Curated annotation (Swiss-Prot):
Cofactor(s) in the UniProt record: FAD
GO molecular function: flavin adenine dinucleotide binding; NAD binding; NADH-dependent peroxiredoxin activity; oxidoreductase activity, acting on a sulfur group of donors, NAD(P) as acceptor
Quaternary structure note: Homodimer.
Further comment: The active site is a redox-active disulfide bond.
PANTHER family: THIOREDOXIN REDUCTASE 1-RELATED-RELATED
Annotated positions binding NAD(+): 356-370
Protein name in UniProt: Alkyl hydroperoxide reductase subunit F
Residue stretches in coiled coil: none
Organism placement in taxonomy: Bacteria, Pseudomonadati, Pseudomonadota, Gammaproteobacteria, Lysobacterales
Family membership: Belongs to the class-II pyridine nucleotide-disulfide oxidoreductase family.
Name of the gene: ahpF
DNA repair in keyword set: no
Protein source organism: Xanthomonas campestris pv. phaseoli
Length: 530
């Protein structure tokens, strides 16, 4: 199951283990149990610190296996086969159960260790989901750190009865003590913030006490990361306030056009961005959403008010708030979000195996989604508002070659239908004849572009009719000292490599602004100061 190269790498990782790892496997006579045992038996051969016990017990999930160590009360289990994107989760779990320290911040680790109460987490994932490992790894670490936290990571494809009973149509989906806890990508910081009700107040007080920055970057995507690095390299006080570090990149499956890196995945790039920024003296403030920008007053400081009630001040600000998936804004979309309405075909596609779905949008993203889904689902209907598809010709040719795809153009989606629990259909208007049409299906994947995260700037910073921040060729906005970069701006072509360049440029422009505004007004002023 593991090739020679992977075994060599894994053997090297397992040398970091400092205490015994006990694997307790719960199996039956299924082919899945045999497949899981093949993997576990290979792991045992890679380290003398790993042992395997096989049980034909009454565990509700078979095949599954738990990881523990003598003398420690750890409850961490994988149900299914953690390969694909989740293989890294398995490796990290082995290391952490085996005593290798986590790289999480010491303050966060202490917060997890002191959580009060009993928490039984269940995370449903799919092997093709790039968002799932973050959640699985966060909760696995929590289970290692705190004996009152238990976690089971469940491959939804292997436990379809549970998925259907709980009507799970989006991953990752997390249950806590039998009740729905949350869905979508979550960091350990975000999870702890939901469990520790006083965390937000403590965080706000800590932020409010910070001194003013020279450069404050709002947003932690490619543009914000580049801006932070370039600003910090100038030796000036730099801060980053971000709702989630990595931004939209975290939701990108495959990246093949970032020059010098032939192929990577969004979460890997996001992790690399944060690692690079942390090499410099940058104050990173995660889980922070900006709600208002107040231009500089008499003190020369721009103020950013945050959703938690705290405020940050800075001599200059770089706005790199990025963009989010654009919604259809039709009846039923919000009601059935994560109940059949989805925005990530890579994550949620496997949950619709054998079902009928629609993809809304005929650009590159929509056509790529339809092609990917066609290999999983029973049938795909692609719905495009325009009278023709806008995707690259090579993608259109591939799409039209698929036998289980129907293309509808000149169609305006008007409603998502459901039975109160899940999606059952879609309504669209034929824009050529005006007829109303219904499609029976179980899933709707929305791929109609991005919407800039700039609502909090309305009335303060000049925005285009599309809501993008208007910038000049130096990244300057119409507010002195406020710069902007990335997908939230009017700069054409929303690409990672372009966003990084724009972020770097904005930082250099901000530094130039600081020099010019702090310089003495006249030569006489310099002489007097001397």
């Amino acid at each position: 199951m593991l090739d020679a190269n992977l075994k060599t790498q894994l053997t090297a990782y397992l040398e970091r283990v400092t205490r015994p790892i006990q694997i307790n496997a719960s199996i039956d006579d299924s082919a899945g149990s045999r497949e899981m045992l093949d993997l576990l038996e290979e792991l045992v051969l890679l380290s003398d610190k790993i042992s395997l016990d096989i049980h034909r017990d009454d565990n509700q999930r078979k095949p599954s296996f738990a990881l523990t160590t003598p003398g420690q009360d750890i409850s961490l289990r994988f149900a299914g086969l953690p390969m694909g994107h989740e293989f890294t989760s398995l490796v990290l779990a082995l290391l952490q159960v085996g005593g290798h320290p986590s790289k999480a911040a010491a303050e966060l680790i202490e917060q997890v260790q002191h959580l009060e109460g009993d928490y039984q987490f269940e995370t449903y994932f799919s092997l093709s989901c790039q968002n799932c490992p973050d959640v699985v790894q966060a909760l696995n670490l929590a289970a290692v750190l705190n004996p009152r936290i238990k976690h089971v990571a469940i491959d939804g494809a292997w436990f379809q009865d549970e998925v259907q009973a709980r009507q799970i149509m989006s991953v990752p989906t997390v249950y806590l003590n039998g009740e729905l806890f949350d869905q979508g990508r979550m960091t350990l910081e975000q999870i702890v913030a939901k469990l520790d009700t006083n965390a937000a107040k403590r965080d706000a007080a800590k932020i409010a006490a910070k001194e003013a920055f020279d450069v404050l970057v709002v947003g932690g995507g490619p543009a914000g990361s580049a801006a932070a690095v370039y600003a910090a390299r100038k030796g000036i006080r730099t801060g980053v306030a971000a709702e989630r570090f990595g931004g939209q990149v975290l939701d990108t499956m495959s990246i093949e056009n970032f020059i010098s890196v032939p192929e990577t995945e969004g979460p890997k790039m996001a992790a690399a961005l944060e690692q690079h920024v942390r090499q410099y003296d940058v104050d990173i403030m995660n889980l922070q959403r900006a709600e208002q920008l107040i231009p500089a007053g008499a003190d020369g400081l721009i103020e950013i008010k945050l959703a938690n009630g705290a405020s940050l001040k800075s001599k200059t600000v770089i706005l790199s708030t990025g963009a989010r998936w654009r919604q259809m804004n039709v009846p039923g979309e919000d009601q059935y979000k994560n109940k059949g309405v989805a925005y990530c075909p890579h994550c949620d596609g496997p949950l619709f195996k054998g079902k009928r779905v629609a993809v809304i949008g005929g650009g590159n993203s929509g056509v790529e989604a339809a092609i990917d889904l066609a290999g999983i689902v029973a049938h795909v209907t692609l719905v495009e508002f325009d009278d023709k598809l806008r995707a690259d010709e090579v993608l259109q040719r591939k799409l039209r070659s698929l036998h289980n795809v129907r293309i509808i153009t000149s169609a305006q989606t008007t409603e998502v239908l459901g039975d109160g629990q899940k999606v059952t259909g879609l309504v669209y208007k034929d824009r050529t004849g005006g007829d109303i049409q219904h499609i029976e299906l179980e899933g709707v994947f929305v791929q109609i572009g991005l919407l800039p995260n700039t609502e909090f700037l309305r009335g303060t910073v000049a925005l285009s009719p599309r809501g993008e921040i208007i910038v000049d060729d130096r990244g300057q906005t119409d507010v002195p000292g406020v710069f902007a970069a990335g997908d939230a701006t009017t700069v054409p072509y929303k690409q990672i490599v372009i966003a990084m360049g724009e972020g770097s440029k904005a930082a250099l422009s901000a530094f130039d602004h600081l020099i010019r505004t702090s310089a003495p007004a006249t030569a006489d002023s310099v002489a007097q100061a001397a």
